[in-house]
C-alpha cells in the first residue's frame, strides 16, 4: 500500500508525521511530494528524516508548486511516480500534512474492499461553500462531458483510498484538462471522486480520517436553517452576512479536534461517533464515515510543540511493538 502525502511545512513536522505512519500504518510506503513553494532546502528535510530514522518514505523528485485548492497536481505527481515503480494492483491512500493516525488497523480495514471515498452529490443549492465554484469550473465541466455527462461528486481527500489502476486511469483523463488555473475550491475533493463514480468504480467504504471540517459544517448548516430566512439570499456562500457569521463561528474554535475526539477514535467508540456518520448539505444526505472505520483525525496543528500532536505521539509510542528505529521500510511485496 502507498500513501500519497504532499508537504510544504517544517521538516521536523514532516518527519514526525512519517513516524506516525510507521507506528499506525507500517504496511504503507509514503511517497512525499515536496511543494516547489516549500520554504526549506531539501537537505534540511533529508536530515530531519534521517534523524528520526524514517524508513517508510520515498521523496518524489518531481516538485510542482502547490497552494490552497491546488493540491491535485501534487497527488497526481505521486500517482505518476507510483505508476513508474509499483504494481497496478496496489492501493493508494491520500493524506494531507495536517492529519494524523491515532489507532492501528488501517491496512486490515482497507484489505476488505477496493475503493474508499465519500459519495457527496454536488448540486445547485448545496450548503457546501465550494459547490458553486465547482459547478462553474470549466475544466470540471469539460471532464464531465467527456465522461458522458457525469454528475459532480465530492469526497474528503484525507483518508480516501483508491485502487492504483483506477487512479492511473483517472490521471490520464485529468491530463487533458487545465488544473493549473486557480478555481476557488479544492479540486482534489471533487475531480477524483467524480471520475471514479463515472467510471463505475466499486465503493467499499468511506475515508478513514475524521475531519473537524464536518463538525463545523454540521453546526453551520443547522444555524443557516434559521438565519437564512432572516438575512435573505439563502444558499449564496459569498453573501457578506453569511460570510461574517461563518468567520465568527470559525474563530470560536468549537469544532477543533481535541484529545477527547482523539480518544473516541482511538477507542473506536462507535456510539459516541454515530451521530456524525451522515450529514445533509441541504439538498442531499451523504455518509461521512463508516462505523468502526475511523483511524485518524484532521486537523492537527503543523507545529512540533502542539499539545495535540504530542498526545498523539504518545499514543503511537504506546502502540509500537518495538523500538521505532527497528521499523523496516515496506517492500514492494508488502505493497
Task: Please give the residue ranges for each predicted region.
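ER/Golgi luminal nucleotide-sugar-dependent glycosyltransferases, focusing on the catalytic module
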Residues: 1-335
Amino acid at each position: 500500500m502507498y500513501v500519497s502525502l504532499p508537504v510544504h511545512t517544517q521538516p521536523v513536522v514532516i518527519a514526525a508525521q512519517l513516524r506516525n505512519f510507521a507506528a499506525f500504518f507500517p504496511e504503507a510506503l509514503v511517497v512525499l511530494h515536496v511543494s516547489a513553494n516549500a520554504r526549506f532546502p531539501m537537505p534540511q528535510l533529508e536530515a530531519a528524516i534521517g534523524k528520526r530514522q524514517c524508513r517508510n518514505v520515498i521523496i518524489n523528485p518531481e516538485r510542482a508548486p502547490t497552494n490552497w485548492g491546488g493540491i491535485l497536481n501534487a497527488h497526481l505527481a505521486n500517482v505518476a511516480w507510483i505508476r513508474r515503480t509499483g504494481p497496478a494492483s496496489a492501493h493508494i491512500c491520500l493524506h494531507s500534512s495536517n492529519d494524523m493516525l491515532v489507532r492501528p488497523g488501517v491496512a486490515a480495514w482497507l484489505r476488505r474492499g477496493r475503493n474508499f471515498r465519500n459519495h457527496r452529490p454536488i448540486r445547485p443549492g448545496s450548503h457546501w461553500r465550494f459547490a458553486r465554484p465547482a459547478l462553474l469550473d470549466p475544466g470540471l465541466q469539460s471532464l464531465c462531458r467527456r465522461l458522458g455527462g457525469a454528475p459532480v461528486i465530492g469526497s474528503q481527500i484525507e483518508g480516501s483510498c483508491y485502487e492504483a489502476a483506477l487512479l492511473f486511469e483517472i490521471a490520464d483523463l485529468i491530463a487533458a484538462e487545465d488544473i493549473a488555473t486557480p478555481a476557488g475550491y479544492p479540486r482534489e475533493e471533487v475531480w477524483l471522486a467524480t471520475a471514479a463514480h463515472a467510471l463505475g468504480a466499486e465503493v467499499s467504504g468511506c475515508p478513514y480520517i475524521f475531519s473537524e471540517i464536518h463538525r463545523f459544517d454540521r453546526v453551520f448548516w443547522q444555524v443557516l436553517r434559521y438565519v437564512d430566512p432572516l438575512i435573505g439570499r439563502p444558499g449564496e456562500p459569498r453573501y457578506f452576512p453569511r460570510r461574517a457569521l461563518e468567520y465568527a463561528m470559525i474563530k470560536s474554535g468549537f469544532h477543533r479536534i481535541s484529545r477527547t475526539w482523539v480518544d473516541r477514535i482511538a477507542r473506536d467508540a462507535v456510539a459516541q461517533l454515530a451521530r456524525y456518520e451522515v450529514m445533509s448539505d441541504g439538498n442531499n444526505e451523504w455518509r461521512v464515515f463508516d462505523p468502526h472505520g475511523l483511524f485518524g483525525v484532521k486537523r492537527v496543528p503543523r507545529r512540533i510543540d502542539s499539545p495535540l500532536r504530542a498526545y498523539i505521539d504518545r499514543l503511537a509510542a504506546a502502540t509500537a511493538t518495538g523500538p521505532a528505529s527497528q521499523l523496516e521500510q515496506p517492500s514492494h511485496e508488502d505493497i
